[in-house]
Amino acid sequence: MSRYQHTKGQIKDNAIEALLHDPLFRQRVEKNKKGKGSYMRKGKHGNRGNWEASGKKVNHFFTTGLLLSGAC
């Protein structure tokens, strides 16, 4: 089991109260997955790009040994 490294420095008096004010136990707002307030500006798969066009670039720079052997 790993130990949590708190950010409160040297705890002197009340360790439980110091941990309650640590960022580990801060309040978090959950984002709705569906319904009101669930719109996400960036899509789920928006950063993948166009995968069909990327494969065409690889074939453009590909050279074979047949071209080199015909020059001799």
Swiss-Prot record:
**Effect recorded for K34C:** About 75% ribosome rescue activity, after 10 minutes. About 50% ribosome rescue activity, initial rate
Q: What is this protein called?
A: Alternative ribosome-rescue factor A
Miscellaneous note, as given in the UniProt record, is:
Active protein is only produced when SsrA(tmRNA)-SmpB-mediated trans translation is limited. ArfA can be synthesized from truncated mRNA, via ribonuclease 3 and the SsrA tagging system. The arfA mRNA is cleaved by ribonuclease 3 within a hairpin structure, probably immediately after the Gly-55 codon, which produces a truncated non-stop transcript and leads to ribosome arrest. In the presence of SsrA, the stalled ribosome is rescued and the incomplete nascent ArfA is tagged for degradation. In the absence of SsrA, truncated ArfA chains are released from the ribosome and are functional.
Q: What is the effect of changing R41A?
A: No change in kcat for peptidyl-transferase by RF2
**What is known about what this protein does?**
Rescues ribosomes stalled at the 3' end of non-stop mRNAs. This activity is crucial when the stalled ribosome cannot be rescued by the SsrA(tmRNA)-SmpB quality control system. Binds the 30S subunit, contacting 16S rRNA with the N-terminus near the decoding center and its C-terminus in the mRNA entry channel; contacts change in the presence of release factor 2 (RF2, also named PrfB). Requires RF2/PrfB to hydrolyze stalled peptidyl-tRNA on the ribosome; recruits and probably helps position RF2/PrfB correctly in the ribosomal A site so RF2's GGQ motif can hydrolyze the peptidyl-tRNA bond.
User: How changing A18C affects the protein?
Assistant: No change in ribosome rescue activity
Provide the phenotype resulting from gene inactivation. Answer: Cells lacking this gene are viable, but those lacking both arfA and ssrA are non-viable.
Q: Name one GO biological process term.
A: rescue of stalled ribosome
How does it associate, per the subunit comment? Answer: Interacts with the 50S ribosomal subunit. Interacts with RF2/PrfB on the ribosome. Contacts ribosomal protein S12 (rpsL).
According to the record, mutating I11N results in:
90% decrease in kcat for peptidyl-transferase by RF2
Chain segments carrying region Disordered = 30-53
List, alphabetically, the InterPro entries matched: ArfA
Encoding gene, per UniProt annotation: arfA
